[in-house]
Amino acid sequence: MNKTKRKQQSNKVALKRDYKSDSDSDGDADALSTNDGFVEPEQKPIISKPPQKKKKYKDNETNKVKPPTIEEMKELRDTRNLFHSNLFKLQVKEMLEELHLKSKYTDYIDKWLENFTTFTEQLEDGLMDRCQLEVPLHLHKKTINFIFSKPEQPPQLIGAASQGTLLQPNFIVDIALEMPKKCFEKDDYLNLIYDQKRALYLAYVTDKMKSSSIYREDQFAYNYYANNPLKPVLELTPFAKIGKHLKFRLFITAPVETFRLGRFVPSNNNIRPILFNDEWNLEEQPLPSTQHYNANVLFDLTLSANQSLLNKSFQGRRNFQDGLLLLKVWLRQRQLDVGFSGFSSYILAMYIVHLNQQRVLHQSSSSYQVARTVWNQLANSDWTKGISLAQQATQEQLSFVVGFYDVCFMDITGHYNLCSNVPLAVYKRVREEAKLAVDLLNDMKINSFSYIFMQKCPLYTRVDNILKITKATSVQQLLLLQNHTEMKYDYANYGYPQMLKTLTDLLEKGLAQRIHGIIPLETAVSPWSVDSKAPIIGQSIQLGLILNPEHAYEVLDRGPASQDDDEGAAEFRSFWGDKSNLRRFQDGSICEAVVWAAVKDSPAKKRLIVKDICLHLLEHHFKLDKDDVQFIANELDIVYKLSPWFKVNKLMDKTKMKEELDQNTDSEALTPNVIRCYDELSRQLHGLNDLPLEIVSISGVSPIFRYCESQPVLPQTRLLANRRIHTNHVLRVVIQLGQSGKWPNELAALRALKTAFLIEIGEKLKEQCHLNWSLTSEGLLIIKRGYCFLIELAHSKESALLKQQINERGITTYVDNPQSRDLERRHYILPKVSGALHSLHQSHSAYGPTVLIAKQWLASQLIDDGLWSPMATELLVAYLYQQRHAPFITAAPQTGFIRLLQLMSLSDWQGELFLLNFNNSWEDQQIADLEHSFRSDRESYPPLALATSYDQQHAGRLWTTDETPNRLVLNHVSKLARHALELIETNLMSKSLQFLRPAQLFRASNEGYDLVIQLKPELLANSLNYDMGSPFVDFGQPNFNLPLAGQDRLAHIVAHLRSAYSDYAAFFYKPHGGKELAIMWKPPNVFAPKAFKVNELQASTPCVGNRNQVQVSRDTLLEDFKLLLKDFYARICTTEDLKREQKQHSKPKRYFQINPKQFENESMKPKKQIHKPTKAKTKTINTKKLKGKKILLKSKPIKALV
């Protein structure tokens, strides 16, 4: 589809949404309206009119505006009743116009079919001994004598080509060629003989086509239709240019009278034990039914009758065809039509026919009504009870068939189940997606077009965990140990559906309420050459688990009481094995139970309970080891774990902590400790005596109070002898005092009084609670149990004074400015948003960890806080958890991160406003007004526009600015997200047993940078997170020196570099533990010679030979960079130099393995400035000589922590 064209068309039209109720939102109501505004084109005869005399135009009030015609009024009425807005209608109409098949394709298809019909008429009967091609069948074969007989019926178009609903971008035209009845004998329906003859017939026709001059230059390949090894088809790609987008697929079928259809009822057996050399005692056990194999044969036998029904229903009805096109786009975007168990568009086409038969759809229903009615009916359907296209079908017949299949939808003959291979979980998934589509259409607050039709929703983004079994030996072992021998006959010994059924039944029983469903994740089989043997497929399986957050992480499975239900207890023990134990519960009952984790375990460990259950069941029932199975659940959680370099036992020994810390802890598990400490501090603040004013509210506004701090926060704050506080994290708290009319009306005086209040609070805390404190320019620093809190005092008068301006007439006015907005955000709006995000995490426990992974990913890509606001990440993830763009909100942080990557890769930053309506406090009209303001005055909003319901008049402009992030950074992040998604999808859907390593995602590329400034590692503390390494140099020994509270010198210097030199270079660094600063020069035209101007001489030098011109010198810029970096600077080099050094040196060159002298020798300073102290001078330091100089404090207590 041409997205650019659609966007341009949408932008050209000035549109307003009509927020009136949709009276036809449900099933039967859809059927009552007969038009949605789409006027189907009709050929009208041209009627010549006699020339008329020109009439003089009278300029009066009645002739200025022409009244609308009946057609226009009808179109407006239908637009109001059926669509959100005229925009949605135009988008659907334009998409359908793009989807319609061009005449060049239809002409080519008709000509090709005509030539192929002529070709089949020229075929001659004969033996198969002259066929040189491989037979496309790889199952149990029986030696048979087969004589080819030419087709008696001409080939016919089937499927989408016959219905006029071929879908872009690659058109697949299905052709059916019917074998004559004389090719078969009476008992050929038994033991796969029919399937072998069908494959032989296909090989013979293919061989003759290859030798024909008509098709000699075309490409021939075999493939399996719907990944079914019993359904080989020929794929022919024309040699002509049209073959880039068009291919033909040849099916071989049989006439309906070949076999009596009654032989293929679900209860019959058509595969005998002799085929597999099995022994079977018919007196002890009857032959198993082969309902799925029978349906496989019935597909061919009933194809002609079903195709006739489709042709009758669709041909000449553009509304049905377009409605099916809309449904096919929706289904394709969700990948629900792929593989052996896929819900194909063929089923949707038949369902449209069924609804038409039931008079739910009318012949005059428009294309939009067709799609909407199908979704609405599908969302409220129950195919487990059976539906049928056959007029004579009775409920008794359906009840009989239902017992053999998960889902039942009988065809026109009443014998073939169209959903014979569709598992119940896939049908439920389609039903949930249909319900979501209806909900999106009914939501007047959003334009649902992009969510329904445009955005890809791969199945792996809809599941929380993925189970993969890809080893051939493991698959064979599983099939050997499964106890359902009848399945081998039912599926003709095809392994994949047997594994799918076996594993699904086992895991659904074991996981019970912990999951919403188990979905197979399939990929289409690749075609193979007609000269090669058919490949063996079905030797691997991938299952996606959709977790139920309410029960997924329960630590115990309780079984029946042994004294009341002996058989149930025995069955429970047999199912769970040695994991089951007798336990006494608080109610006094003694029951069998399985315990998976302790109640006090970390959330990350509890998220592995489902994994532990699945692996245990596979080991207990099928003897599969952990190495034989890959369970993808929490591979990315490692990025916010505590670094193994940091030893918590030393911290606990030094600080004598009461709480025990686990070395395997992470940021999420450490957060409750901080919140408990904060709650205790809040109680102490409220309990302070003799304060001039009462403290009325206390709000924690740091990310950790909403579970969004990606760095582990440990109780390691230290107060040194000089009253300076050193810590890694400063936790911000905003307090408000009671009302008083004595606050001054001048800003300086008010701030001085605030400082006095903070000093008073600090002294009271010291006196009454024995807490150390220190005053800074930002607020009051309090140390409590090893954590450092920064208390800020909020007063509404301060914001008003910041807005106060006196104009030329002496009149006082109040105008918003950046300082006042920032103060309002920090003191009044952020506490509310922080509380809302905290509540969101309490409702959806995966929210916080998803933010942690996202923040770590952005930081690893050298996107620091100066380029991308951390609050933007938190709000974007919250937007995902608030919007119902998926049937289920994910319970896995890893899946939440994948969905965020998808949002970043697909979002139109320029045209989308991200609204977060916390607690539904925004009225519909307020949202409409904000969206109208955003569309009409887009330039006044930042490139990334985020708005919450607490932002008041600053909505959309509060959390991001024009530079954080700017458009270049947004585009860069979108590209990074697309690349990350490609890596994830490739690894998830591959047959490999190994998932991608986190370092593949969480380490930036070192390509594209012009220079790298290496910084002295001993002056920069490492991140407490698990370090994935630097993109430029190798690992080295880290340091964990504590910085001065609230100071990030490197971030401050980089901010200064950007403010001064952003016109000449872009600067990138890793904000957590980064030891390098990467530089990208701006385009060469920035450094081109320019005219001499006094105010544009920054880093400029005169041009050689032309004193009237100057140009910016990169060497001068580098000297400025080194001057700003001062003590941090070690050396400057290119990425090529670093790569060369890594190859030449075995030792890493990042941390303390390098002698500090080496940094000096390799720096770009003049040699005369290099000091080389002797060993005698390095043993002691004369502190008297250092008095009065700025030095880096290195206290032994801080250093001794690690």
Curated annotation (Swiss-Prot):
Any single GO CC term annotated in Swiss-Prot or TrEMBL for this entry: small-subunit processome
InterPro entries to which the protein is assigned, alphabetical: NOL6/Upt22 (IPR005554), Nrap_D1 (IPR035082), Nrap_D2 (IPR035367), Nrap_D3 (IPR035368), Nrap_D4 (IPR035369), Nrap_D5 (IPR035370), Nrap_D6 (IPR035371)
Main localization category: nucleus
Keywords: Chromosome, Nucleus, RNA-binding
GO MF annotation, one: RNA binding
UniProt key word RNA-binding: yes
GO biological process terms, semicolon-separated: ribosomal small subunit biogenesis; rRNA processing; tRNA export from nucleus
Superkingdom, taxonomy of origin: Eukaryota
One of the Pfam families matching this protein, by short name: Nrap_D4
Disulfide bonds: none
Record has Cell inner membrane as a keyword: no
Region annotation Disordered: where it falls in the sequence: 1-64
Subcellular location: Nucleus, Nucleolus; Chromosome
Record-stated family: Belongs to the NRAP family.
PANTHER family in UniProt: NUCLEOLAR PROTEIN 6, NUCLEOLAR RNA-ASSOCIATED PROTEIN
Subunit structure: Part of the small subunit (SSU) processome, composed of more than 70 proteins and the RNA chaperone small nucleolar RNA (snoRNA) U3.
Role of this protein: Part of the small subunit (SSU) processome, first precursor of the small eukaryotic ribosomal subunit. During the assembly of the SSU processome in the nucleolus, many ribosome biogenesis factors, an RNA chaperone and ribosomal proteins associate with the nascent pre-rRNA and work in concert to generate RNA folding, modifications, rearrangements and cleavage as well as targeted degradation of pre-ribosomal RNA by the RNA exosome.
Name of this protein: Nucleolar protein 6
